């Protein structure tokens, strides 16, 4: 069974978000992050300790990350985000474990502002699996979750100026460039801009209709 949706409320298209498999996409599986699981602790620490992934995914001071940092990040993803999942490649054979390759989450609003119904995407893909379209696939999946399941009206994402390819990717996925904060970030001995992008529920539904024509 697949969930049928349209911007008018009339069933005009069939979305790929399957009710029977809501935590899968074409090539990926999205599983819960487990704060008490040693393997998840190791994986999140590994992501935090990859300099390129770390610098592109957040604007904190770049420095060696401890295992505690990985555990804290895992706890945030599992317990404090609106949704936070580990992105995995399916196991190649029955009984084997899925291969974790990244993490994606929607930040949760504080209780007194939830009526605004927006969230920001956080995404990290391990260096070995970058450049293969997994990040794009995961973003498309989390947008479906945001608008079809969580009932959000708006989803936001940011891109750092020293990673210009990220902003171009987000725009290809349908995000609109909404703001530029000039020279907000200090990195590599230079000042860099931060790009703010957003997508509304109606934007997303229009994209779904275009893809089904």
Where are these regions (language model features)?
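GNAT-family acyltransferases
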Residues: 1-128, 191-192, 196-213
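Conserved acetyl-CoA-binding loop-helix of GNAT-fold acetyltransferases
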Residues: 124, 131-148, 164-172
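Conserved GNAT acetyl-CoA-binding A-motif
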Residues: 148-158
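Short, solvent-exposed loop/turn elements at beta->coil junctions and helix N-caps
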Residues: 107, 181-185
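Conserved active-site tyrosine of GNAT-family acetyltransferases
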Residues: 170, 175, 197
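Amphipathic alpha-helical recognition patches that constitute DNA-binding helices
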Residues: 43, 120, 137, 154, ...
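Conserved beta-strand-loop-alpha-helix junction that forms the acyl-donor binding cleft
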Residues: 126, 157-167, 184-187
């Amino acid at each position: 069974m697949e969930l049928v949706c349209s911007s008018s409320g009339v069933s005009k298209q069939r979305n790929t978000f399957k009710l029977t498999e809501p935590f899968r996409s074409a090539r990926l599986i999205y599983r819960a992050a487990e704060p008490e699981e040693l393997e998840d602790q190791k994986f999140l620490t590994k992501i935090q300790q990859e300099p390129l992934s770390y610098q592109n995914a957040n604007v904190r001071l770049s420095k060696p990350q401890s295992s505690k940092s990985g555990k804290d990040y895992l706890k945030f993803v599992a317990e404090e985000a609106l949704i936070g999942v580990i992105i995995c490649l399916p196991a190649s054979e029955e009984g084997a474990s899925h291969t974790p390759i990244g993490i994606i989450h929607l930040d949760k609003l504080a209780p007194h502002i939830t009526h605004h119904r927006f969230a920001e995407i956080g995404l990290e893909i391990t260096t070995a699996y970058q450049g293969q379209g997994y990040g794009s696939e995961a973003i498309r999946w989390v947008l479906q979750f945001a608008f079809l399941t969580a009932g959000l009206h708006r989803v936001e994402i940011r891109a750092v100026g020293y990673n210009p390819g990220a902003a171009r990717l987000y725009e290809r996925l349908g995000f609109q460039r909404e703001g530029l904060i000039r020279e907000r970030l200090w990195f590599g001995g230079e000042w860099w801009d931060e790009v703010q992008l957003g997508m509304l529920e109606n934007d997303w539904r229009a994209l779904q209709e275009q893809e089904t024509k």
